[in-house]
Amino acid sequence: MKGLLSLSVLPVLAYASPMIVDSIHQNAAPILSSTNAKDIPDSYIVVFKKGVTSTSALAHQNWVQDIHTSVESKRMKKRNQFTFKNEAFDGLKHTFDFAGGFLGYSGHFDEEVIEQVRRHPDVEYIERDSEVHTLKAATENGAPWGLARISHRDKLNFGTFNKYIYASQGGEGVDAYVIDTGTNIDHVDFEGRASWGKTIPQGDDDVDGNGHGTHCSGTIAGKKYGVAKKANVYAVKVLRTSGSGTMSDVVKGVQWAAESHLKSVGEAKKGNRKGFKGSVANMSLGGGKSVTLDRVVDQAVAVGMHFAVAAGNDNADACNYSPAGSKNSITVGASTLADERAYFSNFGKCTDIFAPGLNIQSTWIGSKHAVNTISGTSMASPHICGLLAYFLSLQPASDSAFAVAEITPAEMKDNMISIASKDLLSDIPSDTPNLLAWNGGGSDDYKKIIGGARENDTTEFSSTLTEKLEKLAEEGLTAIYNELKDAVVA
């Protein structure tokens, strides 16, 4: 029976319109599913209520595994010895103990088990695990132009088409976590700055067998193809060679990246990572709406990670997809060389900014020198992730060994939006920000980049206001003149 919903989960669902809520009564945790996602049968993500401790969560996880074992044992005894179909349930898969208080777990459970779980007082909600996939749109021949576009205010021409103007130290001291299919870490364009971080899908190899993650990594930090040419790259593999995976694996990948970031922060504070300036992350992937994934991404941002996520390639409202609908990340739509919204790019109020995403050339798999040209918001998001790393690296080092600037992800997001080139793109719906990413035109002075852009905005506003006032004054004087004229004639 759909309808009744515990009050604790209402705030979470306030912006999750594509969600279906299945709740049998008020004393049972609701089961959430997305109308635009492909569910994985009998697979769930369980999220604990706020206030539940790590100790209580561990006890609960042991409890649910015991129930699972007991139920499976009974099922095995009842099975017909001639039944060859594999009906076994795997039980607990991942545990989530996220910095800042997000606790939960995922697993493959029998309905009898999950019904007991949803009645446990510590459980806030349960979400059906679902498929996640890369957002690649098409493969076409072409030349790189995206870097040039984000370093020029004006529309590209033959003189600026292939000229990327940038600060040479861009990305230095910044770690970029690419949560995707992996990265070809031996590619020459990474100059030894790429490392394998973590493989989340069970039984998968530490290699990018798809190419999508490698392409994103190259746009972020490659020597030739990257925005932030000195950044470090860490491959976090959450999708398999096919380019698809599970929502629970993606959630676990985000947790791993955030934990790795916090370790780096700790090491820097101890003086063991001099020059460390922070961490950025890119997620050029998506699926249906997932309250859990959006929540976890926002939690990673809360602990200091700067996140860029792809808006999606459905030519639809980005708010209906995850992680595009996360509140605190930067959601990126795709633009073309002609300064149009790419025909496939999602849009809407959840889209924060646009970046080049059509015919983008970058690193690939197959050899240390392989390249490929592909399109999608998957290619736009790494431009913004690279810009996040680029701008972080321009921050002045503090007096301590921990050189992370006093700029939060929220402030960085606001600044990037404030300096973006405005109203240049065509085919932008009215509810979508018409903003195209800009890197400051090669300046290495972050404060001047931000201050100059805001000063220009103020000047433009003042100029526009003056023009309007002058027009009103002119209209007012004309009206007075006409009144006097009419009076004289009368």
UniProtKB/Swiss-Prot annotation:
The active site is at residues 180, 212, 378. It is found in: Secreted. Pfam families: Inhibitor_I9, Peptidase_S8. One of its GO terms (cellular component) is extracellular region. InterPro entries: PCSK9_ProteinaseK-like (IPR034193), Peptidase_S8/S53_dom (IPR000209), Peptidase_S8/S53_dom_sf (IPR036852), Peptidase_S8_His-AS (IPR022398), Peptidase_S8_Ser-AS (IPR023828), Peptidase_S8_subtilisin-like (IPR050131), Peptidase_S8_subtilisin-rel (IPR015500), S8pro/Inhibitor_I9 (IPR010259). The keyword Transmembrane helix does not apply. Residues 1-26 form the signal peptide. GO terms for molecular function: serine-type endopeptidase activity. Residues 144-450 form the Peptidase S8 domain. Keywords: Glycoprotein, Hydrolase, Protease, Secreted, Serine protease, Signal, Virulence, Zymogen. Residues 43-134 form the Inhibitor I9 domain. Residues 27-134 form a propeptide. Its EC number is 3.4.21.-. Glycans are attached at residues 282, 456. One of its GO terms (biological process) is proteolysis. PANTHER family: CEREVISIN-RELATED, PEPTIDASE S8. Secreted subtilisin-like serine protease with keratinolytic activity that contributes to pathogenicity. Belongs to the peptidase S8 family. This is Subtilisin-like protease 8.
